[in-house]
């Protein structure tokens, strides 16, 4: 009788163990599936990289939904910035945003220079208007600083030289999901041998040998949404309180009307 009870107990433990292991594997499968979905969602945009001639976007269709008015061809918005904290509590950030209207085949935006303090006092922000013609950035505002002027006129978006054909090789990412928004995040370790990392090191002052982290963020439906948002960040930060990163995004939305501006 005692032996039969032990057998029943033993079988119960085995069944419980299998159930726990099965749940664990199920969670792993779900996380792997979400990782693949996030990569697939980004691939729709990243497969377009590198976009050496930004004017190609005038003829490039994006994801369309009910937010688009009839006849609206939409607008591509491309963005790149470089953020660096040289001093504790202070963040220096420079970059450009450009809106390419497919209806008018015109591209306008601005180059920004920000200095942001933790307490927000003495924070500084300056925008310089730009437009693009014949794939060339044209500065519309007067800039006295010759070095800054050259940086603006020679600026290249990350999407113009980035190449993510090997996106599938980024594996075992740290995936987090906020179903209330919804939003999705995935982080992948990169190698200093990665061509994208080499490109960034050649273009920006990155005083660390630390291999960066690739961060993908999506707000909205994974399948696509004109009101959603995708952001790519390559983070070289050495410590939690320091910042050294490049942020890139390319999004397709309804074109802005003059009344909206």
UniProtKB/Swiss-Prot annotation:
Keywords: Cell membrane, Lipoprotein, Membrane, Palmitate, Signal
InterPro entries cross-referenced by the UniProt entry: Csa, Csa_sf
Domain of life: Bacteria
Locations listed in the record: Cell membrane
Membrane topology of this protein: Lipid-anchor
Signal peptide span: 1-22
Cellular component, GO annotation: plasma membrane
Positions where lipid (N-palmitoyl cysteine) attaches: 23
Lipidation (S-diacylglycerol cysteine): 23
Pfam families (alphabetical): DUF576
Family of the protein in this entry: Belongs to the staphylococcal tandem lipoprotein family.
This protein's name: Uncharacterized lipoprotein SAV0440
